[in-house]
Amino acid sequence: MRTTTCFLSNIHQYLSIKRLIPNAREMLLSPPSSSLFEQYYSKINLFANNDIEINNNEWEKAVEVLRTPLPVSFRWNSAIDFQDKVGNQKHQGKRQLLENNISYKQLQFVDAWELNVDARALQNDIDKKKAFRWIVAQTRSGVISRQEVASMIPVSLLNIEKNHRVLDLCASPGSKTRQALEKLCNTIAIKSDDLGIVVANDVNLKRSFIIANRCNVLGLHTQRLCVTNHKAQSFPNISIKASTNKNEGAAIVDGQYDRIVCDVPCSGDGTLRKDPIIWQRWHPEFSQKLHPLRKFPILFSPEIN
């Protein structure tokens, strides 16, 4: 039933795209062509260099990267309770990838793999079906988390410790939230009395549910997760207990977060690598309309730190 539902959903999505863009199928199978996106960015001196030739060369390199399909990447679960499963599946994963003629690169700053294949090829190539099914199975079990490499960087740099209070202000779809929660729980047992917590916020209620669902695979570790539904610009400065130690009293501190993640809404230009149809639909207003939404959460975040 699930397979049938997914199949029908994909057909519906394709037909919807087909109605909007007559050559949708051809666009999916061929490299993107010149577009308003390229015209706009090539004229605004994006690289701020007085040498026109250098600017043109840099722009050509940027477009070349954007036209390159985004490699599949995933992060290994770092929560302490998953370490045995992770160790076992790393051996299984290496074997599955080798059998399907797929190579991988171990990232240096986080325990994650980047494959030499993009998502569309991985899913549609018959010779890679076993590797695809293995990735799906390990994602559902919580052993790995599908996440773009760029998305892994912020939390990796925060040096989150077991007693930290972390706020993810614009959290949906929850990949960074889950990464932060795993970092919080990678050196302590589930029943520890430490007060570390991740507060994940999103303005959209449905997206807040997505965050909770994404972290659900972590089981009891989610007792350290609080999902909220507020505007980032006016997130309440909540009070948190400073300690549960009776000898230290019951001091209360206001909004004293040790780490804040603020991944504000973006133009989505990078998704060109995943969805070539965007090349034809892109418009400068997409980014311009988001400017106020990006500005205010960044200005507001220090006030609740």
Q: Each predicted region: which residue ranges?
A:
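S-adenosylmethionine
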Residues: 1-305
